[in-house]
Design a protein with these regions (language model features):
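Conserved GH/AH loop at the N-terminal boundary of individual WD40 repeats
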Residues: 48-49, 106
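Short, small-residue-biased leader/transition segments that mark boundaries at the very start
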Residues: 2-3
Length: 209
C-alpha cells in the first residue's frame, strides 16, 4: 500500500488541517489531519482494486496519477489511468468518502474505447475543475515514454481532452456529448495533451479566505 505517492492536495479552507495524497501504483488515497491534541494523524480511506487482463501476467493497477479537491472541499476527484475511469467521492466526512460518480474514457479494460466519436488512445490522466465545480476537463497523456509503452497507438492517434459535467449539489458525473478536443488533428500533429488551466483561476491554484 501507499506505493509511489504522487499528488498532495489540502482543503482550500486555510483553517482546515485536512489533506489527501494519492499513491499511483498501489492506487490508494491517504487522508491526514491534526487531532484535538495537536498531533498529526493519517489513515488510508480509498482503495482501488487491481483488475485482471488476458494480456497481462498480473492484474492491472489503476495508476492513480492525480487527485483534486473541489473548491468547496466537498468532493475529491481521482483518475485510474490504466483502468480508464474517473471517480468522484463525497468527502464531506473526510474519514468516510462516498463514491458519487464514475465515468469511463479509454483505458486498457476496453469499457470506453470511443468517446464522442473519437477513438481514445490513453486513459484519463491530468484534470482540472472549474471554480463552480460543474466542469471537469480531463486529458489523456501522462508522460510520452509511458504513453508509448502502455498505449502505443497514441503515437498515431494523439491525445484528447474531454469535458465532464459534474453535479456539485447532489454528486454525479457524465461526459458532455458536445465537447471533445482531438489533439490528433492538430497541425504538425498528432499532438498530446497533459495539463489544463483556467485563466481566471481553478481548483488547483486557488484558496478561499
Amino acid at each position: 500500500d501507499v506505493y509511489k505517492r504522487q499528488e498532495v492536495k489540502f482543503h482550500h479552507n486555510p483553517d482546515s488541517t485536512h489533506g489527501f495524497c494519492g499513491a499511483a501504483l498501489s492506487s490508494n488515497v491517504i487522508h491526514w489531519w491534526k487531532n484535538d491534541a495537536g498531533k498529526w494523524q493519517w489513515e488510508k480511506i480509498i482503495d482501488i482494486d487491481n483488475e485482471p487482463h488476458p494480456d497481462w501476467p498480473i492484474p492491472i493497477p489503476g495508476v492513480m496519477s492525480a487527485i483534486l479537491v473541489s473548491m468547496d472541499d466537498k468532493y475529491l476527484y481521482l483518475n485510474n489511468w490504466l483502468h480508464g475511469d474517473m471517480r468522484q467521492y463525497d468527502i464531506s466526512d473526510p474519514h468516510n468518502p462516498k463514491l458519487t460518480g464514475q465515468i469511463w474514457m479509454g483505458g486498457l479494460l476496453g469499457k470506453a474505447p470511443v468517446v464522442n466519436g473519437v477513438d481514445m488512445a490513453g486513459g484519463p490522466q491530468m484534470f482540472q475543475l472549474s471554480l463552480d465545480g460543474k466542469r471537469l476537463y480531463v486529458t489523456t497523456s501522462l508522460f510520452s515514454t509511458w504513453d508509448n509503452q502502455f498505449y502505443p497507438e497514441i503515437r498515431d492517434k494523439g491525445g484528447v481532452m474531454v469535458m465532464i459535467d459534474c453535479d456539485p449539489e447532489n454528486g454525479g458525473m457524465s461526459i458532455n456529448p458536445d465537447f471533445i478536443v482531438n489533439f490528433g488533428n492538430e497541425p504538425n500533429g498528432p499532438s498530446r495533451c497533459h495539463e489544463a488551466r483556467y485563466p481566471g483561476g481553478d481548483c488547483t491554484s486557488d484558496i478561499w479566505l
